[in-house]
């Protein structure tokens, strides 16, 4: 649906969601790409986020999440997709000033630690702040990388160990718990209660 929608159609839908959140008291939110996973759709989504941000009254923090999942057309060419994100997409969105952050989903079902390192290292070189979807389904899938790279946040962390949480604290990485994901996707909340 996102790939087929026009920029104006996405803007209308985004306004609806923004207005609903504003009605609930939200004054600042993060909006991520990552549902198009090709150049045109990622740029379209980020330009919609910029337009919505310019309208106000809600402050929107734009984040590139092209490393959310490997798109079907790259199923057998993962490395090519990772290189494209790191070497082409990130420089383009950074040069256009479309994002403040770059996020990557580091997990068995998404991107490996090395693939995530490639994407986030490129983002860091281009002046973007970092976020990592980390240790959501299995420990050791991204939180240590978040600490190593000095990410702003490590998100999810349902399976993070106490040692990993301590490394995040020592590195100044803010852990972010996403309760909706926790309760919708995982029967065990692991270390989430201790983080909160």
Where are these regions (language model features)?
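Active-site-adjacent C-terminal substructures of enzyme catalytic domains
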Residues: 129-130, 139-196
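Metal-coordinating catalytic core of metallo-dependent amide/deamination hydrolases
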Residues: 1-15, 19-20, 27-140
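Alpha-helix termination/capping residues and helix-transition junctions
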Residues: 23, 95-99, 148-151, 170
């Amino acid at each position: 649906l996102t790939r087929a929608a026009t920029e104006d159609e996405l803007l209308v839908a985004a306004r609806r969601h923004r207005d609903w959140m504003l009605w609930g008291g939200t004054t600042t939110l993060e909006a991520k790409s990552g549902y198009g996973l090709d150049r045109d759709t990622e740029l379209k989504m980020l330009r919609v986020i910029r337009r919505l941000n310019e309208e106000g009254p809600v402050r929107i923090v734009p984040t590139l999440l092209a490393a959310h999942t490997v798109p079907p057309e790259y199923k057998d060419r993962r490395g090519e997709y990772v290189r494209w994100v790191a070497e082409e997409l990130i420089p383009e969105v950074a040069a256009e000033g479309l994002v403040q952050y770059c996020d990557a989903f580091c997990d068995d079902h998404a991107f490996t630690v090395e693939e995530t390192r490639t994407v986030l290292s490129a983002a860091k070189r281009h002046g973007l702040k970092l976020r990592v979807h980390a240790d959501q389904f299995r420990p050791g899938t991204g939180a240590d990388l978040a600490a190593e790279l000095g990410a702003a946040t490590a998100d999810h962390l349902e399976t993070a160990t106490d040692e990993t949480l301590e490394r995040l604290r020592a590195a100044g990485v803010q852990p972010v718990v996403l309760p909706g994901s926790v309760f919708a996707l995982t029967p065990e909340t692991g270390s989430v209660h201790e983080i909160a």
